[in-house]
Amino acid sequence: MSGKELNKIVAAILFASLIAMMVGFVANILYKPTLELQHRGYSVAVQESSENQNTTASEQAPVNIPELMKTANADNGREIAKKCLVCHSLDKDGPNKLGPHLWDVAGRPKASIADYKYSPALSKLGGVWDDDSLFAFLHKPSSYAPGTKMSFAGISKPQDIADVILFLKTYVHDK
């Protein structure tokens, strides 16, 4: 290929690029958008449902645990506690899984299973697992013991928590 042919090819490429650029400028002049966006993307307006508002209100309102325990249902608690079995065992002297076994947990000193390594957040709590502490922990473990390694989000309905506590208290006597 001679130098003249190479020059013709380069000139054709430059000319085509120039034409494409000119067409773009003309199109921008003719079809200039008049709308200037404040932000990118698409926003969806969502109204909070009354269910969400009630949940927030119930989380803030004090809960009468003794009254809830009077109406608690251990059979319902057994069903709700099935999600606990992913990480915990309910058997007497059962194996520790991701969490310690829950046999006889109601009334037991906190962080007291010798062969389980508790998080420092739970180890420093002290005391026993009574109705109040079980209720607070099952409602939102991360709030009751900040830094706990228990990743469970918690049980939102107070009556469900009372049912689980009653199940944990009566389970010891069923076996």
Curated annotation (Swiss-Prot):
Keyword check for Cell inner membrane: no
Q: Where in the cell is it found?
A: Cell membrane
Membrane side Cytoplasmic: residue ranges: 1-8
Q: Pfam families given for it?
A: Cytochrom_C
Residue ranges of the TM segments: 9-29
Give the keywords, sorted: Cell membrane, Electron transport, Heme, Iron, Membrane, Metal-binding, Signal-anchor, Transmembrane, Transmembrane helix, Transport
The record's listing under Gene3D superfamilies reads: Cytochrome c-like domain
Which domain of life does the UniProt lineage start with?
Answer: Bacteria
Q: Where does heme c bind?
A: C84, C87, H88, M150
Keyword Cell membrane attributed: yes
User: Periplasmic compartment: which residues?
Assistant: 30-175
Membrane topology, from the record: Single-pass type II membrane protein
Q: Which family does it belong to?
A: Belongs to the cytochrome c family.
Q: What does this protein do?
A: May be involved in electron transfer from bc1 complex to aa3.
- Protein's recorded name: Cytochrome c homolog
Q: Which gene encodes it?
A: cycM
